[in-house]
């Protein structure tokens, strides 16, 4: 099922076409990419917008010390849309998360630097990431999840491309998501 979703995805740009081919190649190796035990594994992210699509909900990530989109590891779950919804609910406490579209918003291979998580070293690895467009009302009560992030807040679309402290993510991912958002159903 996941392979069919990725094969049928129409890339938005050259980066997505190249990354899509690499993800499909990795899937052909027979490695278990659904669990984080491997140096490349699936993750799901959410570009969480307000219903008017003027604001993005982001969390200040505890490990990266930066404002970031919401999401997490597949951990064996092949339905990455469900993973994205669950992660939004867990990471910001939103109870009313609406799937704006079941289609993939974007696809990317994300490099993850080695880091310490819960006192244990996690080696550098790659996230084979699918991003989905989700909606949360700005009236919804959201809050930080202490073990994952230190704060949660809304940003305008332009702020989402400039405020986060990770320049690569701003330039290569968040700006792309905003461009894609303008033409996404």
Regions from the PLM with identified roles:
Residues 1-10:
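Generic N-terminal amphipathic, Lys/Arg-enriched alpha-helix
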Residues 10-45:
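Acidic, metal-coordinating catalytic segment for phosphate/diphosphate chemistry
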Residues 34-69:
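N-terminal strand-loop-strand
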Residues 75-168:
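Unchanged
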Residues 165-185:
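Charged phosphate-binding loop/patch that engages nucleotide di/tri-phosphates or the phosphate backbone
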């Amino acid at each position: 099922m996941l392979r069919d979703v990725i094969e049928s995805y129409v890339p938005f740009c050259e980066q997505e076409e190249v990354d899509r081919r690499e993800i499909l190649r990795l899937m052909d190796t027979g490695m278990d990419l659904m669990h984080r035990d491997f140096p490349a594994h699936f993750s799901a992210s959410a570009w969480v917008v307000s219903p008017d699509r003027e604001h993005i909900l982001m969390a200040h990530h505890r490990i990266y010390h930066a404002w970031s989109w919401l999401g997490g590891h597949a951990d064996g779950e092949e339905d990455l849309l469900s993973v994205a919804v669950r992660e939004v609910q867990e990471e910001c406490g939103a109870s009313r998360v609406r799937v704006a579209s079941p289609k993939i918003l974007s696809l990317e291979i994300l490099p993850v630097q080695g880091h310490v998580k819960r006192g244990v070293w996690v080696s550098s690895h790659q996230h084979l990431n699918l991003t989905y467009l989700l909606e949360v009302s700005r009236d919804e009560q959201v809050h930080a999840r202490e073990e994952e992030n230190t704060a949660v807040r809304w940003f305008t679309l332009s702020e989402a491309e400039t405020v986060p402290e990770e320049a690569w993510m701003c330039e290569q991912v968040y700006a792309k998501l905003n461009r894609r958002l303008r033409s996404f159903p």
